Amino acid sequence: MSENEIKWHTLEKHQTKDIHDGHVNGSLIPVWRNWDKTISVKPEMVYVTSINPGERKGPHLHIIRHSYYVCIKGKVVFIIKEKSGKYLEIESSEENPVLVEI
């Protein structure tokens, strides 16, 4: 992937069900499976960050890094400045999970 390339992958979301009565008890979102070939650079670190309701984080700047992001609860809008100077907005949420690769 070139330095200027930004990718995003729409992720699958599956309901999970209780084993006793079958009611929906949550969801499952496969972020990475080795046969999908969505992750092009082997991760060296994985972490989870959270934010309280009504709060905002950012801006946050990384100059040299290959990163993957996905929102697992709520909604996040990633605002990414491309090498051309153009800004790109990518939304990821618990309803519509998107894996962003920068």
Residue locations for each model-derived region?
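Non-catalytic, conserved peripheral segments adjacent to functional cores
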Residues: 1-98
